[in-house]
Amino acid sequence: MAPPRHARLVAATIAVLLCHLPRSAASPSWSDAAVSPPSPSPQLCPMMQQRSVLPPRVSELPASPFTAKAAFVRYWNRKVHSNRPHPAFFFAKLSPLSAPDAAAFSTLAAAGQLGSRIRAFCAAASLLCPTTPGSSWSKSSSDGDGAAAAAAPAGGGGGGGGGGDGGAAPFKNYENGNFSSYGNSGGGGADQFAVYSSGQSNGGGGGGGGVDSFRRYGKGSQGRNDSFTSYEAGGNVGTSSFTSYNGDATGGAGGFSSYAGDANTVAVSFGNYDHTGNGRSREFSEYTQDANTGEESFAAYGKTANGAAESFRTYGNHSNSIATGFDNYGDRANGAADAFSSYGASGNTPENTFKSYASGSNAGVDDFKGYRDDANVGNDSFTSYASNANGAAAGFESYGKSVNPGSVTFKGYGLGSNPNHRIGFARYSGDNTTFKAYSNDGVEFKEYQNMSKMEVSKIEAAARRPPLRWSPEPGKFFRERDLVAGNRMPMPDIADRTPPRAFLPRDIAAKIPFDAAAVSALFGAAPGTAMRQVVSSTVAECARPPSRGETKRCATSAEDVVDFAVEMLGDNVVARATESTAGGGGDVRLGRVAGVPAGGNVTRSVSCHQSLFPYLVYYCHSVPTVRVYEADILAVDSNQKINHGVAICHLDTSDWSPNHGAFIALGGKPGEMEVCHWIFQGDMTWTVAN
């Protein structure tokens, strides 16, 4: 019996589609298989001999029409009418959720029960989620290079024993995102932890973009010497927390060499160092040295310790646009000898807060050498120094000796009812300064200078300016005149070092309140953790009012990104990004340079930048009066093409801060010059199509 007419029509339609699919193009379900896709039969394709038909785009042929990715393909085709190929860099970020998973998680989100399956959700949707402590690492389970812990279940190893038998417990490398415990309750011997999350480019727990957590090191140990060499150094987007280091320890000596040094965009916290320790000498060498942008905090150092000799060498020095907070140093300690060498020195536009130093201590010898010296503008406050101390001998050498004026406040120095102390303050200087209160008994105040009342020439100020270690990387900003064929110029490292994540389908993203508390609760980001800081920072930036002439939106789904671009520019749009990271970190030569749209006229664009969040969130803003360029990037020695870059030139910089990195790198002032930069990996710019 002949098949029904509608069945014949369906079969004919399938045959035509197969004819239009070239042999080299495979659907996603075939691309993972070990066999080649079936070729259409010549008998089914008489029209192939008569005319050539453009093949459909691969992204239009998903394995299942019900997946989140397939739904977005249809959405794009309805909204964007520029008839351009789908941008591969953008479509690679789409949700990998299968149709059943997307439906199940959407139902849970609608019922407010997504948290009950959060681990499965994170894994299936390719999200960034805090790790959960797994099995403990011990000396017997590792050869010292971290291999055993790295192979432990997701969430990182513990370190319960840490060589509690009195021997040395070296631990050289650890690259996962969570470490529960190391060297607790050990007796005698020495602990050594060399490297934790050092400068990985990206991935789940690396210093390049991981969310690292170290919970406890050496708690309750007796007579053990310990050292921690490096924690999340050299990374990009450092997001880490260290909860406790040698709490309740007795005897021995401790050292922490470096924490989040040379990091970019930090959100780091250190909870407790040698809390209630007894008779220990310890040193913390560097904390977020040479960091660029972000927030950092240190909760307590040597609090309620007994007979301790403590030193903290540098905190946030040579950093750019860092908001720092140090809550507690040596408070209520007994017989302590404390030294803090430098805090926020040579920083650019810092926001520094130091809340308490040696308050309520007994018979302490305290020394603080420098706070925000040689810094450039910014706002700083120091709340309390040796307040309510008994028998204290304290010295504070320098506060607020800045290169350029900032707002600095010192609220209390040596205050309290007990006059049995000897305290000296060597120098307090700066513009816009206030010193609210200090004890009149037993306190020697040598010098207070208000720089606005002093005649300091620009030449003298420039002469004492230190080298700008926080200057932007060469090539990060440049002038429009540099975009000419044949020009040799430095290319910055444009690699995306944030952890890999995917968009959520809009159907799910819309059911998650874009609120710091709600997102943190859902993904298990506890207060005080790095993930909580990251979430709060992103939500706050999205809530910031736009600048003059700027229209901004935080897009929590791929559909939101498309909607904003179409709303700003119309439906004839194209998304562009720099093709790869080739050439970054060295000199390159420019090949063909072309303005987009054609002619390089002044235009309006939409730029979208990744924000650090559990799932992909883009900060998109419509920027008026720009020019956008495409350029072939060539190797200097061979003139061979190695990359294809996209650059944007901002023609109106009048609302930019005078301390913006572009003016530090190029000179000039806001409104007096244009500033250009490459579109970094992971970011994108939208313009009207040619």
From Swiss-Prot:
Protein's UniProt keywords contain Signal: yes
Superkingdom field: Eukaryota
Transmembrane annotation, as ranges: none
Comp. bias (Gly residues): 154-163, 201-211
Keywords in alphabetical order: Glycoprotein, Signal
Ranges for region Disordered: 134-163, 201-232
InterPro entries: BURP_dom, PG-associated_BURP
Tissue-level expression: Expressed in panicles.
Signal peptide: 1-26
Keyword Signal: yes
Compositionally biased intervals (Low complexity): 135-153
Designated name of the protein: BURP domain-containing protein 14
Taxonomic path: Eukaryota, Viridiplantae, Streptophyta, Embryophyta, Tracheophyta
